[in-house]
UniProtKB/Swiss-Prot annotation:
Region entry Important for catalytic activity, spans: 19-63
Superkingdom of origin organism: Eukaryota
Organism in which the protein naturally occurs: Trypanosoma brucei brucei
GO terms of biological process kind: proteolysis
Active site: 147, 202
Gene3D superfamilies reported in the protein's UniProt record: 3.40.50.12660
Function of the molecule: Cysteine protease that cleaves specifically after arginine or lysine residues.
Protein localization: Recycling endosome
UniProt: Ca(2+) binding residues: 162, 178-179, 209
Protein name: Metacaspase-5
Ranges annotated as biased composition (Low complexity): 444-461
SUPFAM superfamilies: Caspase-like (SSF52129)
Glycan-carrying positions: 70, 113, 219, 235, 258, 264, 283, 332
Keyword check for Lyase: no
Length: 500
């Protein structure tokens, strides 16, 4: 009953309120991730190319993993996380971020180029794919939009509460610990690999357990001098990692019903942190790390959201250097001393990237030039201005894609293009006039007079003689009496009467 009420409230709130904070809160402590097993299965993943950027990156590969979970039909249902993935893809295309390999995990199979459902098993598998066989010069991008949660800290934890990433099947399979996220995605990165991670979920400030963070309250001024601080003395990595999170470890992130007020060209539901971060990417060309970060906070504060985005990194970033999604991080000289010496050594490019050669994709792979994701127009670059997050590495914009194969004991996954169906107009049947039957006059029956029976006189029976009546019987003359004739007698009777 409680679950049904929670589901009903979540659906009604999503449809009525301007934004919803639907937090899961605490979850049971999940089981640990088998990192070795996950890395052994990473080669099974089949990435795609989401779009073709005008200026490809030639210093290495650009791999991206997008995860959006709406938890449809559950008490934890959200409304805009799948939309966040689409919006992030569109934003990266507009700034010409040249993704060469991409996987998309969303709980909507209708999503273009859907890769897999975001279950716990799949999320772990594709996280391993993201960092599998990476080399110096490779660039990684990770985006998660969904639920974050807290769980009681373990015996080996330095915190009272650990943070968790919540997969689609968390109620059966459990969540994913922040300790495991670091072990799986960050710890093994080689020097020269750059990763940018964006978490739009609750309790997300330290989901990667990075050692350096920008520590400042909600009302910090942009006019002050800001620096990263060391927040833990372990979890170092040779890779260069920058993480943007939607809120503090104890905070929550909002799911917005209508995102049109952010000015990004979207109107559907979405995460407030994703909207603010993408707005900063699109509107702060050439700005520094601190400018991008403070703009993200300012957008949310002006719109009345209570969440405070956070910034953390694997190394002490100089916040006043120009922001980029590429290349090594420029470190703050005053904080480098806190890093062990092995993590600050310079790195050399991978031999496969030192002399890039022209490589073309097979003819069977479709990569239409400037084909936008879901029909969003590609940002124009005819004015010659550079786009944030894109670096040509000193090369002309006419460079070609990096090699698709690299000499290694572990072959890199085969590069595969984002499937684009052949351009085809809607079916038009052959032009044909409506059927015109042959012209015919209305049926005219043959002219006939009304039926005239043959003229015939009334029936006249043939005349015939009727039998003549029998002749009257003849009177037989009675014989006279013997004696005298009558006349004679009468003759004498007319005299004198006689006597009787």
């Amino acid at each position: 009953m409680d679950a049904a009420l929670a589901l009903l409230f979540g659906q009604v709130a999503t449809a009525v309120l301007p934004y919803v904070v639907n937090s899961i809160g605490r979850v049971p402590r999940p089981k640990r991730v088998d990192v070795k097993k996950a890395m052994g299965e990473a080669h099974q993943c089949r990435p795609v190319v989401p779009y073709r950027a005008p200026r490809p990156y030639t210093e290495g590969r650009v791999k991206a993993l997008f995860i959006g979970i709406n938890y449809t039909g559950s008490s934890a249902q959200l409304g805009g996380c799948v939309n966040d993935v689409m919006h992030m893809l569109q934003t990266l295309q507009r700034i010409e971020f040249p993704i060469s390999e991409c996987c998309i995990l969303v709980d909507d199979r209708r999503f273009p180029n859907f890769t897999a459902m975001p279950t716990r098993e799949n999320i772990i598998k594709y996280m391993a794919w993201l960092v599998y066989d990476v080399r110096p010069g490779d660039v990684l991008f990770f985006h998660f939009s969904g639920h974050g949660a807290e769980t009681k800290g373990g015996r080996d934890s330095n915190e009272k509460m650990d943070q968790c990433l919540v997969p689609l099947d968390y109620d059966k399979a459990g969540a994913i610990l922040d300790d495991d996220l670091f072990e799986l995605m960050i710890k093994g990165l080689p020097a020269g690999v750059r990763m940018t991670a964006v978490f739009d979920c609750c309790h997300s400030a330290s989901l990667l357990d990075l050692p350096f963070a920008f520590v400042a309250g909600r009302n910090v001024s942009s006019n002050q001098r800001h620096e990263m601080r060391m927040v833990r003395k372990d979890n170092y990595s040779r890779g260069d990692v920058v993480m943007f999170s939607g809120c503090e470890d104890s905070g929550t992130s909002a799911d917005v019903t209508n995102t049109s007020s952010f000015g990004n060209g979207t109107v559907a539901a979405g995460g407030a942190a994703t909207q603010a971060f993408t707005w900063a990417l699109l509107n702060t060309t050439g700005y520094s790390y601190i400018d991008i970060f403070m703009k993200t906070r300012e957008v949310l504060r002006q719109k009345g959201y209570k969440q405070v985005p956070q910034l953390s990194s694997s190394k002490p970033v100089d916040l006043y250097k120009q922001f980029s999604l590429f290349g090594p991080l420029t470190m703050n000289a005053s904080l480098v001393q806190h890093l062990p010496q092995e993590y600050v050594q310079p790195w050399a490019p991978h031999p496969a990237y030192q002399q890039p050669h022209e490589a073309t994709l097979p003819a069977s792979v479709s990569q239409p030039h400037s084909q936008p994701v879901m029909g969003i127009p590609v940002a124009s670059t005819s004015n010659g201005k550079s786009n944030p997050g894109v670096s040509d590495g000193g090369r002309a914009s006419g460079e070609v894609y990096p090699p698709t194969q690299y000499p290694s004991s572990h072959p890199a996954p085969q590069q595969q293009a984002y499937y684009q169906p052949p351009q085809q107009a809607y079916y038009q049947p052959p032009q044909q006039a409506y059927y015109q039957p042959p012209q015919q006059a209305y049926y005219q029956p043959p002219q006939q007079a009304y039926y005239q029976p043959p003229q015939q006189a009334y029936y006249q029976p043939e005349p015939h003689h009727q039998p003549a009546p029998p002749p009257p019987p003849k009177k037989e003359n009675k014989p006279a009496r013997p004696g005298y004739p009558m006349s004679y007698c009468m003759k004498f009777s007319q005299g004198k009467p006689g006597r009787k």
